Amino acid sequence: MKNILITGGAGFIGSHVVRLFVNRYPDYTIVNLDKLTYAGNLANLKDIEDAPNYRFERADICDYDKVLEIFERYDIDGVIHLAAESHVDRSIKDPFNFARTNVLGTLSLLQAAKEYWTRSGRMTGLADAEANAMLCRFYHISTDEVYGALELTRPEGWAASGQSESGGGPYGDDFFTEETKYQPHSPYSASKASSDHFVRAFHDTYGMPTIVTNCSNNYGPYQFPEKLIPLFINNICVGKPLPVYGRGENVRDWLYVEDHARAIDLIFHKGRVAETYNIGGFNEWKNIDLIKVLIKTVDRLLDRPEGFSLHLISFVTDRAGHDLRYAIDSSKLKRALGWEPSLQFEEGIEKTVRWYLEHRDWMENVTSGEYQKYYESMYSNR
């Protein structure tokens, strides 16, 4: 498989995957399909935009005819599907748009892949599913939020020496595994759960070689600042309030984006079709503790006194359906393919903060205009 369609490749995770594939596989043709909504930014790929093996197509994944035409023009034999609406707060305000993009858009891609791969002889039916995997592959990236929420069961101050297979993490005994049943609680996670089911259905019904992965929260360079880490780095820099839902007790597992891109590369090339793999960072943090780490790191790098920005923390009304804890078990991926995160969380945060401080122009460009209106509408009255 050498003609790879990467959807959402101008976004946060997608741009890291596109860059990795363009640089690592010069004999591949990498086609980046992106609608360029508010979170898509071609400046994320400025360093590889002139690479001879890179192509960009501005298109909506819901436009079936356009998607099929791209399959035909580039003879696409592999898909890495990252395009999605992904912000929970936005999904609560506009669930229809999330259903359209995440469910119908995924279905459009699946149908175009089935049509073209069947016509080109790469897919020959359910009975030949294993053989089909040698000729084409559809890799769908999903989220740990489809699993619902876990409980906080550790006493305050408890510290774990190991996680997952060793029997627990810092905030609870249990983890999401690939066998955890789906219990989505937000319009966003419900839309992703539905798209996951469609991907698996195309394998079970048509023999399409599919893989699904569910990842934890990503962080790193080029993340649009509606997400917690880049939003708060920017706010700390300029002295704006840091709106914290509830009391900041919610727990998330954090994964450095370049580690995620490495996992995607490995799974795309060596993962078993019809399998699901969890990709997590084994880095559980309460939101309030993470925010204090960000404050400490930004203030130190800006030569401010320790604790200088702590007063910016502002507790706001919690959002509806706010899951308490996510923790994902990546043991299967480590056993099967040898992947594990390369960075400790503190090292990843240091790299991330330094990147945003060194790229203030990028941040200023993406936080102007319509984003400012959205930010005010979300947090000004809480």
What positions do the PLM features span?
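N-terminal Rossmann-like NAD(P)+-binding domain of SDR-like oxidoreductases, especially those catalyzing
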Residues: 1-218, 258, 268, 287, ...
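Residue-level detector of secondary-structure boundary/capping sites
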Residues: 189-190, 223, 285, 324
